[in-house]
Amino acid sequence: MAKPSRLFVIILPMLNKLFLVLLLLAIGSSVRAQDKTPQTYNAEGVSIEFTAKPASPEFRQVVAGEEATLRFKITGSNGGVPLTNLRPVAWLDQRQSKDSITARECREMVQSFLQPSFNKRPTLDLNAYFILTLNNEPNISVIDPLSGFGGSKLYTLIPLASYGEDWVLTADNKRLYVSMPAANELAVIDIPTWKVIDRIDVGAMPTRLALQHDERYLWIDNTAGSSAESRVTIVDTVTLKVVKQLVTGLGHHEIAFSDDDRLAFITNDETRTVSVVDVRKLQVLKQISTGISPAAIAFSSLSQTAYVAVAGDGTIMAIGGPRHEVIARIATEPGVSVLGIPATGHYGFALNPKTSKVYVFDLSSNRLVQTVPVGPGSDQISFTQQFAYVRSTGSEFVTMIKLADIGKEAAVTKFPAGQRAPAESALSSHAAAIVPAPEDGSVLVANPADKMIYYYTEGMAVPMGSFQNYRRDPRALLVIDNSLRETTRGVYSTTVRLNTAGRYDVAFLLDSPRVVNCFELTVAENPNVPKKTETAIKIEPVVKEAVANAGTRFNVRFKVLDAKTGTAKTNLEDLNVLVFLSPGIWQQRDFAKSIGEGVYETSFVPPSAGVYYVFFQSASLGLQFNQSTPLTIQAVKN
């Protein structure tokens, strides 16, 4: 038998390897194609195309514990014309069975999600938004305004090392930075998990925060009076390390950036200067004298100019041009200390708490065009597309200035945001107390003296509703909107993180025309995330929406069931119950009493109004307090 040639011996292994590589590439391509293959549903002349893919290129499919982008492309069935300006809603719910749900079951699921009851809630609500309050205590309240278990809208509390002074949220709503002056630290919060993931030592008394437009660096004011510790600390947002502590001048610092992030403008209150900083080199290029107390700074995209409010003499300085010099001075009155420039528009706004006036100036001509009287102690201004909102610390009334009427007889209206003036609260914050709501033409207003948040819609005489902050002073507000957004024409997207692997139903609803459908999503196991340990039992309240009266004994009845079979767990003698008042200022422990057929009972007297959590523990069931899902009870004043 002839021996194979040397050339054949060499080529055969190479061909085998090539075949293997091509096979692996084909498999990989198949997986990627499968992940990206859209699911399509057509009804009522509308075509909805759903895709889900991992946000990170590291993964080929959606995996537990990692972010994924959900995308709904909505077009007309005939011609594929993108349908824009729609308001689709969607929910994700983990499937309990292997079978796909029917169209009827899908409609019933959507209907249950639209109800306020918590008998049936989705794993993830893609229509929710959260209100965050920066409190007088060392914590942040997270409030779910659209729902609430047992009457409570408090979703969670984020503990801090000390009270927060200022905060800034990234554009993708995933990371929140909070300055903590009493701790000399910056807290870094992961929004999807509501956890503080890092605490960074950033020097003495960090107060004001400013995040560049590209979010590369976070700039922190170290307000240390006239001491040598007065500086600006710069943090790299990728490494979460301090890259520079820049000495610009003494006193309080306000910070603004040019649109391209090439320049930073920093006020130095005690030194009476503005520093112009080269961001790339992190070096001071120029110091500009301002006069007594440069109190605020803002950059205009329209005029490419930085404006500085000088409280000492009431001048608004305009810094611009290639040499970064003073190109105009706008005269107002001593005490001007707040600046606001809406994202679109031709005017800037300067507030004077001493004179209770707002000075409106033209960004093109750098001339004063109007002076508007407002409430006493006006210290903050916020904007919607139609109005400027002015908060006054000396009054519960918020002043509204119609932007379209600037330069004419300004249409000024007021509405009450509470019963008491904000100044009656002990602590204030530099962060905004008035923020736009997700709904157009609406705002949320924090009143720390009332311990309430008010929801106001333009055109109304009074707020349409309110949310309590559970005995905490809300000094500032943020809104985190998780709803679907139109990212391109006819494409509505959001980013989510599902921590548990499995199959999910993606319930979709379009109101007009009425389209309901349930798509499917598979979340794979993540080798980097430990599997969730399931408890052997589940506990369900007998009364789904429990409201107690403070000072009156309240009976809590609940069922203990086998998590897999649903069979009642009877005659448990070691079922320990822990009841505590959030945030842990009162608690009670007791053993539950069996009243038959897997139903147990305990009771307690709520000492005051608030949110109470009920946890369970049983040695015989291998259940610890931290493994049980708590029941939530709202206690109200009797």
Language-model features: where?
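Enriched for extracellular/lumenal, surface-exposed ectodomains of secreted and cell-surface proteins
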Residues: L510-R514, F616-G622
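Predominantly soluble domains enriched in secretory-pathway, periplasmic, or organellar proteins
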Residues: Q34-P513, N517-T522, T533-N555, A563-N571, ...
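Hydrophobic h-region of N-terminal signal peptides that target proteins for export
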Residues: L23-V31
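Conserved aromatic beta-strand anchor motif in extracellular beta-sandwich/beta-rich domains
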Residues: V577-L581
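Short, positively charged and aromatic/hydrophobic N-terminal segments
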Residues: V9-I11
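Edge beta-strands of extracellular beta-sandwich domains
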Residues: V516-E525, Q624-A635
